[in-house]
Amino acid sequence: KLTGSENSVVGVTVLLAVLVLRQADFGIKTTHGLLSIAGIFGILIAGPRLSNMLSPIPAFFVNVFCIMLLMILGCHNVIMYNHSTFVLGYLLLQGYDVSGHAYLLRVEGLLAGMVICMAIFYKNQKNRPYRRTFLDLFREFDLSSARNRWYVKLTFIVSSAMLVMSLLGLPRAMWAGIACMSVCLPFTDDCMGRAEKRGLFNIVGSLVFVALYLILPESMYPYIGMIGGIGVGYSAGYAWQTAFN
Protein backbone atom coordinates (compact mmCIF):
# COMPACT_ATOMS: atom_id res chain seq x y z
CA LYS A 1 0.00 0.00 0.00
CA LEU A 2 2.87 2.40 0.70
CA THR A 3 4.01 2.31 -2.93
CA GLY A 4 0.56 1.94 -4.51
CA SER A 5 -1.13 -0.95 -6.27
CA GLU A 6 0.83 -0.20 -9.47
CA ASN A 7 4.00 -1.10 -7.61
CA SER A 8 2.98 -4.43 -6.11
CA VAL A 9 5.82 -5.91 -8.17
CA VAL A 10 8.26 -4.04 -5.91
CA GLY A 11 7.03 -6.12 -2.98
CA VAL A 12 7.57 -9.30 -4.99
CA THR A 13 11.09 -8.26 -5.99
CA VAL A 14 12.13 -7.30 -2.46
CA LEU A 15 10.54 -10.39 -0.93
CA LEU A 16 12.41 -12.70 -3.31
CA ALA A 17 15.68 -10.86 -2.61
CA VAL A 18 15.17 -11.17 1.16
CA LEU A 19 14.43 -14.90 0.91
CA VAL A 20 17.63 -15.43 -1.10
CA LEU A 21 19.93 -13.15 0.90
CA ARG A 22 19.03 -14.86 4.17
CA GLN A 23 21.27 -17.74 3.08
CA ALA A 24 23.05 -16.92 -0.18
CA ASP A 25 26.30 -15.03 -0.53
CA PHE A 26 28.24 -13.43 -3.38
CA GLY A 27 31.53 -15.27 -2.88
CA ILE A 28 33.25 -12.07 -1.69
CA LYS A 29 33.86 -10.30 1.63
CA THR A 30 30.62 -9.56 3.41
CA THR A 31 31.16 -5.80 3.54
CA HIS A 32 31.93 -5.82 -0.18
CA GLY A 33 28.76 -7.83 -0.71
CA LEU A 34 26.88 -4.76 0.48
CA LEU A 35 28.32 -2.92 -2.54
CA SER A 36 26.96 -5.67 -4.77
CA ILE A 37 23.51 -5.27 -3.22
CA ALA A 38 23.68 -1.49 -3.78
CA GLY A 39 24.71 -2.04 -7.40
CA ILE A 40 21.96 -4.60 -7.97
CA PHE A 41 19.25 -2.32 -6.60
CA GLY A 42 20.66 0.63 -8.53
CA ILE A 43 20.21 -1.39 -11.72
CA LEU A 44 16.69 -2.43 -10.67
CA ILE A 45 15.81 1.23 -10.13
CA ALA A 46 17.24 2.69 -13.34
CA GLY A 47 17.50 -0.11 -15.92
CA PRO A 48 13.85 -1.14 -16.40
CA ARG A 49 12.64 2.48 -16.56
CA LEU A 50 15.32 3.45 -19.09
CA SER A 51 14.67 0.46 -21.35
CA ASN A 52 10.96 1.31 -21.45
CA MET A 53 11.74 4.85 -22.57
CA LEU A 54 13.60 3.63 -25.65
CA SER A 55 12.71 1.95 -28.93
CA PRO A 56 13.35 -1.84 -29.16
CA ILE A 57 16.91 -1.74 -30.54
CA PRO A 58 18.40 0.72 -28.00
CA ALA A 59 16.38 -1.00 -25.26
CA PHE A 60 18.05 -4.28 -26.25
CA PHE A 61 21.49 -2.83 -25.51
CA VAL A 62 20.30 -1.39 -22.19
CA ASN A 63 18.96 -4.82 -21.23
CA VAL A 64 22.23 -6.50 -22.25
CA PHE A 65 24.25 -4.06 -20.15
CA CYS A 66 21.99 -4.29 -17.09
CA ILE A 67 21.49 -8.06 -17.12
CA MET A 68 25.20 -8.68 -17.62
CA LEU A 69 25.99 -6.44 -14.64
CA LEU A 70 23.40 -8.25 -12.53
CA MET A 71 25.06 -11.54 -13.42
CA ILE A 72 28.53 -10.27 -12.54
CA LEU A 73 27.45 -8.62 -9.29
CA GLY A 74 25.13 -11.31 -7.99
CA CYS A 75 25.93 -14.66 -9.60
CA HIS A 76 29.63 -15.28 -8.95
CA ASN A 77 28.69 -18.24 -6.78
CA VAL A 78 26.87 -20.20 -9.50
CA ILE A 79 25.53 -22.89 -7.17
CA MET A 80 23.38 -20.30 -5.37
CA TYR A 81 21.33 -19.62 -8.54
CA ASN A 82 21.05 -15.96 -7.53
CA HIS A 83 20.24 -15.00 -11.13
CA SER A 84 16.79 -16.53 -10.73
CA THR A 85 16.06 -13.77 -8.21
CA PHE A 86 17.90 -10.68 -9.44
CA VAL A 87 17.35 -11.07 -13.18
CA LEU A 88 13.74 -12.09 -12.50
CA GLY A 89 13.28 -8.90 -10.46
CA TYR A 90 14.69 -6.84 -13.32
CA LEU A 91 12.34 -8.47 -15.83
CA LEU A 92 9.28 -8.01 -13.60
CA LEU A 93 10.06 -4.33 -13.08
CA GLN A 94 10.67 -3.94 -16.80
CA GLY A 95 7.36 -5.57 -17.66
CA TYR A 96 5.28 -3.66 -15.12
CA ASP A 97 6.63 -0.20 -15.85
CA VAL A 98 5.39 2.99 -14.20
CA SER A 99 6.17 6.68 -14.61
CA GLY A 100 5.69 9.99 -12.84
CA HIS A 101 4.74 9.88 -9.16
CA ALA A 102 4.30 6.10 -9.27
CA TYR A 103 7.94 5.76 -10.36
CA LEU A 104 9.09 7.92 -7.44
CA LEU A 105 7.19 5.61 -5.11
CA ARG A 106 8.84 2.65 -6.85
CA VAL A 107 12.28 4.15 -6.23
CA GLU A 108 11.44 4.73 -2.56
CA GLY A 109 10.18 1.16 -2.21
CA LEU A 110 13.28 -0.33 -3.81
CA LEU A 111 15.60 1.82 -1.71
CA ALA A 112 13.81 0.69 1.44
CA GLY A 113 14.06 -2.90 0.21
CA MET A 114 17.78 -2.44 -0.42
CA VAL A 115 18.36 -1.33 3.18
CA ILE A 116 16.38 -4.30 4.49
CA CYS A 117 18.34 -6.71 2.28
CA MET A 118 21.66 -5.20 3.37
CA ALA A 119 20.76 -5.55 7.05
CA ILE A 120 19.67 -9.18 6.68
CA PHE A 121 22.66 -10.07 4.50
CA TYR A 122 25.19 -8.52 6.86
CA LYS A 123 23.62 -10.07 9.96
CA ASN A 124 23.70 -13.58 8.47
CA GLN A 125 26.99 -13.43 6.57
CA LYS A 126 29.25 -11.17 8.67
CA ASN A 127 31.32 -14.04 10.13
CA ARG A 128 32.04 -15.81 6.83
CA PRO A 129 35.72 -15.51 5.82
CA TYR A 130 36.39 -14.62 2.17
CA ARG A 131 39.48 -13.53 0.30
CA ARG A 132 37.78 -12.22 -2.83
CA THR A 133 36.84 -8.55 -3.00
CA PHE A 134 34.23 -6.60 -4.95
CA LEU A 135 36.73 -5.74 -7.68
CA ASP A 136 37.64 -9.41 -8.09
CA LEU A 137 34.17 -9.97 -9.55
CA PHE A 138 35.33 -7.91 -12.54
CA ARG A 139 39.01 -8.91 -12.53
CA GLU A 140 38.10 -12.59 -12.81
CA PHE A 141 35.81 -12.08 -15.81
CA ASP A 142 37.22 -14.35 -18.54
CA LEU A 143 35.36 -15.76 -21.53
CA SER A 144 37.39 -18.97 -21.26
CA SER A 145 35.54 -19.61 -17.98
CA ALA A 146 32.38 -21.73 -18.18
CA ARG A 147 30.74 -19.45 -15.63
CA ASN A 148 31.39 -16.30 -17.65
CA ARG A 149 30.30 -17.93 -20.91
CA TRP A 150 27.04 -18.75 -19.14
CA TYR A 151 26.73 -15.10 -18.10
CA VAL A 152 27.02 -14.04 -21.74
CA LYS A 153 24.71 -16.78 -23.02
CA LEU A 154 21.92 -16.01 -20.57
CA THR A 155 22.27 -12.25 -21.08
CA PHE A 156 21.95 -12.40 -24.86
CA ILE A 157 19.27 -15.11 -24.93
CA VAL A 158 17.02 -13.20 -22.51
CA SER A 159 17.63 -9.81 -24.14
CA SER A 160 17.13 -11.22 -27.64
CA ALA A 161 13.84 -12.88 -26.66
CA MET A 162 12.51 -9.56 -25.39
CA LEU A 163 13.78 -7.77 -28.50
CA VAL A 164 11.90 -10.16 -30.79
CA MET A 165 8.71 -9.75 -28.76
CA SER A 166 9.03 -5.96 -28.88
CA LEU A 167 9.70 -5.88 -32.63
CA LEU A 168 6.60 -8.02 -33.17
CA GLY A 169 4.58 -5.53 -31.13
CA LEU A 170 3.58 -8.14 -28.55
CA PRO A 171 2.84 -6.98 -24.97
CA ARG A 172 4.72 -8.06 -21.83
CA ALA A 173 7.96 -8.99 -23.57
CA MET A 174 9.40 -9.76 -20.16
CA TRP A 175 7.51 -13.08 -20.06
CA ALA A 176 9.59 -14.34 -22.98
CA GLY A 177 12.69 -13.24 -21.08
CA ILE A 178 11.58 -15.04 -17.92
CA ALA A 179 10.84 -18.23 -19.86
CA CYS A 180 14.27 -18.19 -21.50
CA MET A 181 16.04 -17.34 -18.24
CA SER A 182 14.44 -20.25 -16.41
CA VAL A 183 15.73 -22.87 -18.86
CA CYS A 184 19.15 -21.29 -19.53
CA LEU A 185 21.09 -23.00 -16.75
CA PRO A 186 24.81 -22.94 -15.95
CA PHE A 187 24.89 -26.72 -16.40
CA THR A 188 23.79 -27.60 -19.94
CA ASP A 189 22.66 -31.14 -19.11
CA ASP A 190 19.94 -29.73 -16.85
CA CYS A 191 18.33 -27.56 -19.54
CA MET A 192 16.22 -30.24 -21.27
CA GLY A 193 14.53 -31.38 -18.06
CA ARG A 194 13.73 -27.78 -17.20
CA ALA A 195 12.17 -27.17 -20.63
CA GLU A 196 9.85 -30.19 -20.26
CA LYS A 197 8.68 -29.19 -16.77
CA ARG A 198 8.12 -25.61 -17.85
CA GLY A 199 5.63 -26.58 -20.55
CA LEU A 200 3.48 -28.71 -18.23
CA PHE A 201 3.50 -26.40 -15.22
CA ASN A 202 2.84 -23.30 -17.33
CA ILE A 203 -0.56 -24.90 -17.96
CA VAL A 204 -1.01 -25.56 -14.23
CA GLY A 205 -0.08 -21.97 -13.43
CA SER A 206 -2.54 -20.64 -16.01
CA LEU A 207 -5.35 -22.66 -14.43
CA VAL A 208 -4.42 -21.37 -10.96
CA PHE A 209 -4.46 -17.80 -12.30
CA VAL A 210 -7.91 -18.27 -13.85
CA ALA A 211 -9.19 -19.68 -10.55
CA LEU A 212 -7.82 -16.72 -8.58
CA TYR A 213 -9.22 -14.28 -11.14
CA LEU A 214 -12.69 -15.76 -10.78
CA ILE A 215 -12.63 -16.15 -6.99
CA LEU A 216 -10.99 -12.91 -5.84
CA PRO A 217 -12.80 -9.53 -5.86
CA GLU A 218 -11.64 -7.02 -8.48
CA SER A 219 -9.91 -4.91 -5.82
CA MET A 220 -7.51 -7.81 -5.21
CA TYR A 221 -6.42 -8.22 -8.84
CA PRO A 222 -3.29 -6.02 -8.47
CA TYR A 223 -2.09 -8.35 -5.70
CA ILE A 224 -2.27 -11.57 -7.69
CA GLY A 225 1.33 -10.93 -8.75
CA MET A 226 2.40 -10.66 -5.13
CA ILE A 227 0.61 -13.92 -4.31
CA GLY A 228 2.55 -15.53 -7.14
CA GLY A 229 5.80 -14.06 -5.87
CA ILE A 230 5.21 -15.48 -2.40
CA GLY A 231 4.46 -18.85 -3.99
CA VAL A 232 7.71 -18.70 -5.95
CA GLY A 233 9.69 -17.81 -2.85
CA TYR A 234 8.35 -20.74 -0.84
CA SER A 235 8.40 -23.33 -3.63
CA ALA A 236 11.24 -25.80 -3.20
CA GLY A 237 11.18 -27.18 -6.75
CA TYR A 238 11.35 -25.63 -10.20
CA ALA A 239 8.02 -27.10 -11.33
CA TRP A 240 5.92 -25.19 -8.81
CA GLN A 241 8.08 -22.09 -9.15
CA THR A 242 7.12 -22.18 -12.83
CA ALA A 243 3.44 -22.52 -11.99
CA PHE A 244 3.48 -19.53 -9.61
CA ASN A 245 5.50 -17.46 -12.08
Q: Where are the regions a protein language model picked out?
A:
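Alpha-helical transmembrane segments and their membrane-interface boundaries
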Residues: K1-G231, S235-N245
